[in-house]
Amino acid sequence: MTAPATRKDLMIVNMGPHHPSMHGVLRLILTLDGEDVIDCEPILGYLHRGMEKIAENRTIIQYLPYVTRWDYLATMFTEAITVNGPERLSNIQVPKRASYIRVIMLELSRIASHLLWLGPFMADIGAQTPFFYIFRERELIYDLFEAATGMRMMHNFFRIGGVAADLPHGWIDKCLDFCNYFLTGVAEYQKLITQNPIFLERVEGIGTIRAEEALNWGLSGPMLRASGIEWDLRKIDQYECYDEFAWEVQWQKEGDSLARYLVRIGEMEESIKMIQQALEGIPGGPYENLEIRRFDRVKHPQWNDFEYRFIAKKTSPIFELSKQELYVRVEAPKGELGIFLIGDQSVFPWRWKIRPPGLINLQILPQVVKRMKLADIMTILGSIDIIMGEVDR
């Protein structure tokens, strides 16, 4: 009886675009030698919606509901970058109270994004239990968002020169209660996860990115800080009022999946510190720049005219974007989210180029997964933290 011949050919496997570990419609064409990854080719574009072209045919206020569909788990940051560009282009001042409200909302959104990264990341590597604990805290953040903005997701809260509405009565106390409670939740995560030997086996030394590689590939956010580069735009650019708070940049030296996990866990604790300081020191005053608003004035309005019902309402500010170009950026949960904006004396942007952190960070994936095991792809891809709505735009 002859023994069956062992095949030694390379095997090509398609992972995605409907794989639960892809976190969206990402497709990977993998070349395998047994369990070893020889090559990886990402296929993008399944969620492309032409967001940059849409911006060229909308005013900024008309475009705001669209931007929440880029990174739909951290929508406050896409709104912030959309209003920050025209504000700097037209030199519009933001009241101090509005700036504090923005920082509170941004940091709450950062925590919610990191929580929704941590839960599925743990599920990808085989730990299902933390997933449910993490959703418990995330629901509390969404309840705060709903009370302040009216929406749990896709908030449409930021406006040029401020925010859409002031914080409701009692919201600050509720948020302070959440901050005190959440710190115990983070301690629970660390007790449950960080020293778990099975978790450490799956992440320690997996997907290592050296500092030089991180800089050469243009990585940003936790991906860059986990590789030993202490770079955070909240410290570098000092936009909004981040320079008024005491907090530390979280970073690690190892550059592996464990380091990226530790950076994000540390960032959640630092965000709570900033929120507490902002809530305790929030000033009074207007929540928007009233000079931006334009009211329709009619000398003798008739109650039965078609336009009558619109007179008392605040219309959207429409102004020309001056003929110049500008790059503006914020530190989003996934990295540097930037907009390159060109105005041409029109109410519409002439060019609206989006720099999504997820796309830039994803580019290093083929290099990192080579010579790794097939099962490590889920760990590495999960530690990068991508949202395909932002990657494909």
Curated annotation (Swiss-Prot):
Enzyme class, first EC level, given as a word: translocase
Give the principal location in a single coarse category: plastid
What GO molecular functions are on record for this protein? NAD binding; oxidoreductase activity, acting on NAD(P)H, quinone or similar compound as acceptor; quinone binding
Question: Keywords assigned by UniProt?
Answer: Chloroplast, Membrane, NAD, NADP, Plastid, Plastoquinone, Quinone, Thylakoid, Translocase, Transport
* Pfam families per UniProt: Complex1_49kDa (PF00346)
Task: Write out the catalysed reaction.
Answer: a plastoquinone + NADH + (n+1) H(+)(in) = a plastoquinol + NAD(+) + n H(+)(out); a plastoquinone + NADPH + (n+1) H(+)(in) = a plastoquinol + NADP(+) + n H(+)(out)
- The stretch of residues making up the signal peptide is none
EC number(s) given by UniProt: 7.1.1.-
PROSITE patterns, sorted: COMPLEX1_49K (PS00535)
GO cellular component terms listed in the entry, alphabetical order: chloroplast thylakoid membrane
Question: For this chain's UniProt record, which GO biological process terms are given?
Answer: photosynthesis, light reaction
Q: Does the record carry NADP as a key word?
A: yes
Topology in the membrane? Peripheral membrane protein
Subcellular location as annotated: Plastid, Chloroplast thylakoid membrane
HAMAP family given for it?
Answer: NDH1_NuoD
Family (UniProt): Belongs to the complex I 49 kDa subunit family.
What the entry lists under NCBIfam families is as follows: PRK06075.1 (NF004739), PRK07415.1 (NF005649)
Question: What is the protein named?
Answer: NAD(P)H-quinone oxidoreductase subunit H, chloroplastic
Lineage, broadest ranks? Eukaryota, Viridiplantae, Streptophyta, Embryophyta, Tracheophyta
Q: Which gene encodes it?
A: ndhH
